[in-house]
Regions:
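Active-site-proximal helix/loop segments of hydrolytic enzymes
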Residues: 1-178
Length: 178
């Protein structure tokens, strides 16, 4: 409601499990108008062999990983690699900034109950395969008894949602003002 001009597409809104590939395809199939932007935010819970692992973190694609984000059919082949490299660098910077804003939002909401594990880079399937700025959020560990209780609490989940929302709002405001 706060962003009536923004489209929000949920890959799921009930207890179903689309494959990671389905989620990526759904995101990549969104048609943008001129001057429209798109972000991909994937929300997960973590697991570990250690029951002591705890905390929230936000992941982005490492800058050294290169993907094709510009469709070869849409630009002359002479400039494709240059344009693709420029877009990929822009997407990487936006992903890092979005990750930090979301992490800050989560830290403000849940940082007293769960450790902040920071922003991190890795080639997770969803951030590697979407053609847009993207992050993967891990809200806590289902292998940790304390965090299971938190993640089953509606109040805690509302705080997680508010933290993500506040982080995205800060990112969007900064992005639109610059």
């Amino acid at each position: 409601k706060a962003y009536p001009d923004k489209k929000i597409l949920l890959t799921r809104d009930k207890d179903v499990y689309p494959t990671l590939e389905d989620r990526v395809n759904m995101a990549n199939s969104v048609k943008l108008k001129k001057n429209e932007s798109i972000l991909y935010v994937s929300v997960h819970v973590n697991a570990s062999l250690s029951s002591k692992a705890a905390g929230f973190e936000v992941w982005y694609l490492p800058p050294e990983y290169r993907r094709e984000v510009v469709d070869k059919k849409t630009v002359p082949k002479e400039i494709h690699s240059i344009l693709n490299s420029m877009m990929e660098e822009e997407f990487t910077m936006e992903s890092i900034l979005m990750a930090q804003n979301i992490l800050d939002g989560l830290d403000a909401q849940i940082g007293k109950k769960s450790p902040n594990r920071g922003i991190r880079a890795n080639q997770w399937f969803v951030v590697r395969n979407v053609k847009m700025p993207s992050v993967l959020i891990e809200l806590g560990f289902i292998s940790n008894k304390t965090e299971i209780k938190l993640l089953n609490s509606p109040d805690y989940l509302k705080k997680c949602s508010l933290g993500i929302y506040n982080g995205l709002s800060a990112f969007i405001s900064n992005f639109e003002n610059n």
